[in-house]
């Protein structure tokens, strides 16, 4: 959430920055500043009213002791009137602030200066590529046909049990899933990330804190009876561990990793982009989350990008790293780098990770702060990234490593799978 101070002092800067995200903020910013002016004026009036009320109330006892009942009664009447007025101001202030807050949450985070301009994914900038694209033999198959051929993923059974987008992994397919999760977690913990196992349902405050609510409410599964939400990513519960926390100056860096199943409605998805594992309603993902001092968050972002790149490269998958343009960025991000792997049988790039710096945007919503070296309370910066999302990794592994009679497993995974190939 953007700060009122920033909106009040630099409204044109905010409007120009959000235009990079193709977001027209002028009307909202102008309304916010009017409401903010009202908020401050009402608070000043309320403070004066309460101070006068306290001053008058203190006079009553002395007047009564002096036997000045009529004067005391007159002051009591004044106090009662001031009390009524303060109540009216408080009610007006609550209504004003409610409208103010409802508008504040509609503003996305500002993109940082490194974000390129652009409207769609076509405008994203490729900053690096690695590993060669394999040349497959004749009669190569997409992963959904390979899954059926080797009986490792059953999409039809998932439809029977739940619906489309909920596959059932079987045999070596299930073991490959488990191997990838354990490999990713081990690689993350080896560089200092603390493993946590969070709930996969969160309350509304958690969804609001990381910015999924209200922006992505329509894409989240909502258990309405208890008002809980299934997590779309481990980012939500893990980052919220530090909601309403004030860290010490020496508590940094905070580095956490978690595996969770993730749940997304993905309403409106259709066509080739959703075949097989390309887009699911339930999928497995390992996440890394960091909390940093503002002056150290971009160095942390570079570390996270390098770590995710090392993970992807170790699997032998052809990959590319993209810096997202303003129009393709998420609501909460200040900058995002996407990792994509090449799916040889489909002949297309598949996103497997996003690594983002949110600067203080989430921290402001979370009330996640720290005391600096001078003891001053400041907002922290939050970052997260997928390390990695499994479905498209599996799709690319199956397709790129297929032979006529088997699918070879990358060497780094063999200690985890217990087998060298799927046949």
Residue ranges, per PLM feature:
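TRNA-recognition modules of translation machinery and tRNA-sensing kinases, especially anticodon-binding
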Residues: 26, 129-423
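N-terminal alpha-helical targeting/anchoring segments
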Residues: 1-134, 152, 156
């Amino acid at each position: 959430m953007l700060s009122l101070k920033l909106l009040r002092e630099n409204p044109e800067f905010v409007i120009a920055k959000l235009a990079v995200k193709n977001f027209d903020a002028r009307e909202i910013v102008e309304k916010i500043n009017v409401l903010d002016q009202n908020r401050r004026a009402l608070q000043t009036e309320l403070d004066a009213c309460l101070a006068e009320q306290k001053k008058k109330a203190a006079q009553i006892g002395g007047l009564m002791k002096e036997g000045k009942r009529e004067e005391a009664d007159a002051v009591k009447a004044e106090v009662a009137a001031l009390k009524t007025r303060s109540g009216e101001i408080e009610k007006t202030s609550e209504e004003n602030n409610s409208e103010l807050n409802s508008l504040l949450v509609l503003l996305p985070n500002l993109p940082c200066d490194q974000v390129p301009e652009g409207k769609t994914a076509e405008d994203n900038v490729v900053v690096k590529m690695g590993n060669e694209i394999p040349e497959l033999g004749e009669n190569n198959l997409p992963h959904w046909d390979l899954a059926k051929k080797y009986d490792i993923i059953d999409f039809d059974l998932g439809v029977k049990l739940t619906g489309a987008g909920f596959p059932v992994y079987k045999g070596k397919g299930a073991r490959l899933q488990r191997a990838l999760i354990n490999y990713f977690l081990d690689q993350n913990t080896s560089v200092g990330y603390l493993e946590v196992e969070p709930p996969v349902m969160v309350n509304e405050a958690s969804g609001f804190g990381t910015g999924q609510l209200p922006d992505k409410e329509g894409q989240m599964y909502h258990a309405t009876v208890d008002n809980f939400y299934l997590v779309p990513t481990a980012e939500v519960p893990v980052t919220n561990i530090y909601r309403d926390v004030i860290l010490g100056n020496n508590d940094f860096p905070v580095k956490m990793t978690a595996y969770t199943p993730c749940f997304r409605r993905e309403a409106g998805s259709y066509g080739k982009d959703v075949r097989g594992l390309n887009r699911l309603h339930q999928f497995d993902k390992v996440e890394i989350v960091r909390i940093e001092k503002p002056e150290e968050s971009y160095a942390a972002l570079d570390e996270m990008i390098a770590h995710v790149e090392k993970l992807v490269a170790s699997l032998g998958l052809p990959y590319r790293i993209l810096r997202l343009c303003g129009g393709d960025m998420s609501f909460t991000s200040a900058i995002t780098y996407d990792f994509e792997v090449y799916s040889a049988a489909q002949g297309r790039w598949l996103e497997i990770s996003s690594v983002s710096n949110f600067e203080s945007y989430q921290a402001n919503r979370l009330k996640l702060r720290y005391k600096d070296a001078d003891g001053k309370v400041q907002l922290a910066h939050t970052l997260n990234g997928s390390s990695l999302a499994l479905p498209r990794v599996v799709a690319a592994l199956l397709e790129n490593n297929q032979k006529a009679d088997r699918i070879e497993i990358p060497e780094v995974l063999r200690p985890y799978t217990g087998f060298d190939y799927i046949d």
